[in-house]
Amino acid sequence: MTEAIYETVITTQDATGQAHVAPMGVRYRPLADGSPGVVLMPFKPSVTHDNIVATGHAVLNIVSDTRVFATCVTGRRDAAVLQLLPLAPEGQVAGQRLACALRHLQLRLATRQDDAQRPLLHLAVLAQAEHAPFIGLNRAQAAVVEGAVLVSRLHLLPADKICREMDYLQIAIDKTAAAEELQAWGWLRAAVAAHLQSATPSAAQSATPSPSPAQRQPPAPNPQKDVA
């Protein structure tokens, strides 16, 4: 049976205490003893993987502010969006959580199955806390998450497919987005535009996403992508 994958944000820190934030799909899978667990399978090279192996700890953040996903995959690393808070004094792991998290889970590495491309990290859930209610599903938020996944794969996809996908996702943005989603979407559109402009002139001209009245274009993002 296929396990559901949930889009979350993982915060880790290295041995010196330097924090790292990365969107990551996770599976909720109990440990061998039946206690709650979380599975991560980051692609190498991965700062998240290296930090977890070095410290044995991670924090899983559940967010509804999709700007977190967009700012990470576009390389913007917006400090206001990625604001971190220390864990409560009784925290069981070394780390920080996102200030915008609706909920966070403190994780400790239980087992690791190494792999040349995607190692499997099985982490135990030590503690969790809720900070704000989940108020419901929103189509624009889902579209931003899908757009973020698309942007993370721009180097793998043909230009026409990128534009078709963005145009389809634009429908949900136009109909259901609020200010946060519009800002996140603008960052993603700017990243796509920059990618297409760097392609051959003919490809960029023939594969341009349709303009939208809801689109808010900020300056082009830093092309340097972050490593999960």
Describe the role of every protein-language-model region.
Residues 197, 201, 205, 209-217, ...:
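Intrinsically disordered, low-complexity repeat/linker tracts enriched for polar/charged residues
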Residues 24-27:
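A short, well-structured catalytic beta-strand-centered motif of the EAL phosphodiesterase domain
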